[in-house]
């Protein structure tokens, strides 16, 4: 008959095994954890995890062994390194560059119109007030709607 200590020990092993199994991806199913999968490889991995726990290994050691044997994709939470950072940050960087190019083009377009207006009145003998009036007439007004969405 099992003692109370043996029952507690089995419960601890089972709890740790389930916790680890929920964080390990089934290599056949891909979208399921090995805890939820009934594939042969998932059953074998669950047994391997329980054996490793019984032999006294820590969770971290078990994760490292699984990662070494099956690759980084077996874990649902891969380590965060330079490559992972590049993958996650690339959309933000591309969006920032696109916004910068768009803003530069808008600024350049406004500046070019002002420079063309100055070039038109450059050689003409005008008083400062006439020159200012000509620039006001030749320079287009800023757009009335500054929001990208018309309802604002």
Swiss-Prot record:
Membrane topology recorded in Swiss-Prot or TrEMBL: Single-pass membrane protein
Keyword Membrane present in the record's keywords: the answer is yes
Q: Which residues bind heme?
A: 26, 29
- From the record, give the transmembrane residue ranges: 84-104
Which residues does the entry place in the Mitochondrial matrix compartment? Answer: 105-152
Query: Gene3D superfamilies of this UniProt entry?
Result: Cytochrome C biogenesis protein
Localization:
Mitochondrion inner membrane
The keyword ATP-binding belongs to this UniProt entry's keyword annotation: no
Arranged from A to Z, the UniProt key words for this protein are: Cytochrome c-type biogenesis, Heme, Iron, Membrane, Metal-binding, Mitochondrion, Mitochondrion inner membrane, Transmembrane, Transmembrane helix
Q: Which segments sit on the Mitochondrial intermembrane face?
A: 1-83
Task: Please give the Gene Ontology molecular function terms for this protein.
Answer: metal ion binding; oxidoreductase activity
Please give the GO cellular component terms listed in this UniProt entry.
mitochondrial inner membrane; protein-containing complex
Where is the major localization of this protein? mitochondrion
Q: Set out the biological process GO terms recorded for this chain's protein.
A: cytochrome complex assembly; embryo development ending in seed dormancy
UniProt cross-references to Pfam families, sorted A to Z: CcmH
Q: Which PANTHER family match?
A: CYTOCHROME C-TYPE BIOGENESIS CCMH-LIKE MITOCHONDRIAL PROTEIN, PTHR47601
Q: What does this protein do?
A: Plays a role in mitochondrial cytochrome c maturation. Probable component of a heme lyase complex involved in the reduction of apocytochrome c.
The record's comment on protein family reads: Belongs to the CcmH/CycL/Ccl2/NrfF family.
Q: What is this protein called?
A: Cytochrome c-type biogenesis CcmH-like mitochondrial protein
Organism the protein comes from: Oryza sativa subsp. japonica
* Gene encoding the protein: CCMH
């Amino acid at each position: 008959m099992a003692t109370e200590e043996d029952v507690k020990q089995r419960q601890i092993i089972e709890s740790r095994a389930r916790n680890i199994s929920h964080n390990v991806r089934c290599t056949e199913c891909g979208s399921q954890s090995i805890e939820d999968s009934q594939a042969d490889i998932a059953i074998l991995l669950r047994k391997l995890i329980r054996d490793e726990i019984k032999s006294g290994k820590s969770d971290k050691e078990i994760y490292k062994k699984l990662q070494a044997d099956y690759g980084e994709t077996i874990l649902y939470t891969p380590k965060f390194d330079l490559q992972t950072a590049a993958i996650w940050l690339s959309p933000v960087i591309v969006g920032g560059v696109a916004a910068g190019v768009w803003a530069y083009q808008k600024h350049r377009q406004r500046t070019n119109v002002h420079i063309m207006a100055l070039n038109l009145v450059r050689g003409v003998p005008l008083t400062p007030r006439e020159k200012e009036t000509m620039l006001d007439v030749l320079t287009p007004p800023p757009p009335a709607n500054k929001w990208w969405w018309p309802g604002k």
